[in-house]
Amino acid sequence: NQVNALYYNVFVCEHCGFSFTEDFSKYFSPGVSEEINNQISSKWNPHNFRGERTVFQAIEAYKLAFLCATLKKEKFIVTAGLLLRLAWLYRSLKDNEQEERFMKMSRDHYIESYSIEDYRSTQMSDVRVMYIIGELSRRIEDYSNATRFFSRVIETQRTGGEAKIIEMAKEQWNLMRATREHEHVDVKMESEA
């Protein structure tokens, strides 16, 4: 039986419920500790997340981390990553509705991160962020944003962008175009029938 490392990315304090990942900043702005105490710790029934986690415990840990990140005002790049991992966990349960919900939330947080460039001090590049926005947009069938962001990734090849990601963007752009053409043919055939 293989251990899924994704289940253990979030650290949860068994005493107060504060949850975080290694991506969180160490800084707490004034009033944040009190807010975490009011929103989480005061309602927390002490229990630990040590030992083997189920997918449901992993989901609980990520949701707690997202709440803590929101209260702490972590960067959008951090919250986007938490939401994306929640989408993956729901995908593993074949819960399409929740998967799509968290993909959309993640995509929106990546767009915020991209627009204010809060990813600059991380390992993420603008090309990677644009690709993720494009791919999440494609998956939630927001083809307008998918096209826009894949096109931006592809345009970076003129300035020596990341070749592997540019190729991935081209593949996804072509896949999206083929899917949309197929849908258009199906609609046309239905209207002729």
Predicted regions and their residues:
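N-terminal cysteine/histidine-rich coordination modules
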Residues: N1-N38
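Amphipathic alpha-helical repeat scaffolds of TPR domains
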Residues: E34-H47, F56-L64, E74-D95, M124-R139, ...
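Flexible helix-coil transition and linker loops at the boundaries of alpha-helical arrays
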Residues: R50-G51, A65-T79, E112-Q123, R158-E162
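Structural signature of alpha-solenoid helical repeat junctions
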Residues: V78, Q98, F102-M105, D118-D126, ...
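Alpha-helical linker/edge segments of TPR/alpha-solenoid repeat scaffolds
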Residues: L93, E97, I132-N145, E171-A193
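TPR/TPR-like (Sel1-like) alpha-helical repeat modules
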Residues: R107-I111, Y143-G161, N174, K188-E190
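TPR/TPR-like alpha-solenoid helical repeat scaffolds
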Residues: S121-I132, G160-H182
